[in-house]
């Protein structure tokens, strides 16, 4: 199980699985739905509520379901995670697509999801086995106005579908289009509590992307995920030490993995614009504008190589050759074999952002 999957627990909670690397006894996953008599979703006679904000997810789990929070020794932080012994149902995006194709759609949302899959599969000429249905449709929690969320697995298939989406969206007329100004304003309002960008900045960034659009009058989002075997990383191959939050300016040198979730941007010529310590006794000693940040024990934060995000919305934000401004969590990465380096993780906290520097 990895990015795009969902699981239901013994407590009736539904989590969405995040990332490709997981501890042997737990799945890193975010709370998405919980039983609630006042909820606006219903499935099999049980009402549920969707939990949107990360802070609310954390509060619910801390107060009511602490078994789903754990401090991970490899990731170095407390993570939302599901003990494998508490998993009762696994929702596989590819299997669910196969089920829908076999039995046919039960409503208009499922019909639109199947039509979009057919459009992308035909236009990109990729195997159907690489496509899946995720989001609310995957777990049977969709409403008549729900979005369609798809996932494309595999690097080659992902790049092919990405190219196909650009052709479809750039066509003067067709079944798939970009959001108009009113629709962009609604998306901006939804994301604004977590990412403090102006509407103009948000609209400019969205215009770069092809993974979000409108199909049959409905919002759609396509996520690109490499197969775990293509990444080749096992739990414990790298250890991560959180150092604090930071804002940096850096030149993007590689954006080949910008379309995927998780996404990655290689960077050079890094300058720290702002820092704030956490989890590190004594905090940071830093001269703003310096390229090296030094801790009280004398160890430097040098060799910051990459900006990464586990959130789909930070994909395709900046491009090779551009200067990026990013705010996120600074981490020291310690491989099992090889020298340590640093990275900035964007999207783990409210207020994180990633955008190109404007003159």
For each of these PLM feature ranges, what is it?
Residues 1-132, 137-145, 153-359:
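Catalytic core of pol beta-like nucleotidyltransferases
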């Amino acid at each position: 199980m990895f990015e795009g999957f969902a699981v239901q627990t013994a407590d009736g909670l539904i989590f969405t699985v995040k990332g490709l690397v997981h501890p042997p006894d737990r799945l890193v996953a975010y709370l998405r739905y919980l039983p609630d008599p006042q909820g606006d979703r219903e499935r099999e006679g049980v009402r549920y509520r969707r939990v949107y904000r990360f802070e609310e997810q954390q509060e619910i789990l801390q107060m009511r379901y602490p078994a789903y929070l754990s401090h991970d020794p490899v990731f170095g932080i407390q993570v939302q995670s599901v003990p494998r012994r508490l998993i009762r149902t696994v929702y596989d995006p590819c299997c669910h697509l196969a089920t829908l194709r076999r039995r046919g759609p039960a409503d208009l949302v499922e019909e639109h999801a199947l039509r979009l899959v057919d459009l992308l599969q035909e236009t990109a000429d990729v195997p159907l086995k690489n496509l899946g249905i995720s989001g609310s449709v995957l777990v049977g929690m969709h409403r008549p106005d729900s979005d369609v969320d798809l996932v494309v697995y595999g690097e080659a298939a992902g790049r092919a579908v990405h190219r196909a989406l650009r052709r479809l969206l750039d066509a003067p007329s067709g079944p798939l289009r970009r959001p108009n100004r009113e629709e962009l304003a609604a998306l901006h309002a939804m994301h604004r509590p977590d990412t403090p960008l102006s509407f103009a900045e948000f609209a400019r960034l969205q215009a770069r992307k092809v993974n979000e659009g409108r199909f049959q009058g409905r919002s759609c989002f396509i996520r690109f995920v490499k197969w775990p075997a293509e990444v080749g990383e096992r739990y414990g191959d790298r250890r991560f030490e959180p150092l604090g939050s930071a804002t940096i300016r850096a030149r993007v040198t590689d954006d080949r993995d910008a379309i995927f979730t998780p996404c990655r941007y290689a960077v050079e010529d890094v300058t720290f614009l702002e820092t704030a310590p956490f989890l590190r006794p004594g905090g940071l000693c830093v001269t703003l504008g310096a390229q090296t940040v030094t801790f009280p024990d004398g160890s430097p934060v040098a060799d910051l190589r990459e900006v990464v995000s586990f959130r789909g919305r930070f994909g395709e934000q900046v491009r090779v050759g551009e200067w990026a401004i990013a705010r996120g969590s600074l981490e020291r990465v310690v491989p099992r074999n090889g020298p340590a380096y640093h990275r900035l993780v964007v999207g783990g906290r409210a207020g994180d952002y990633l955008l190109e520097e404007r003159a």
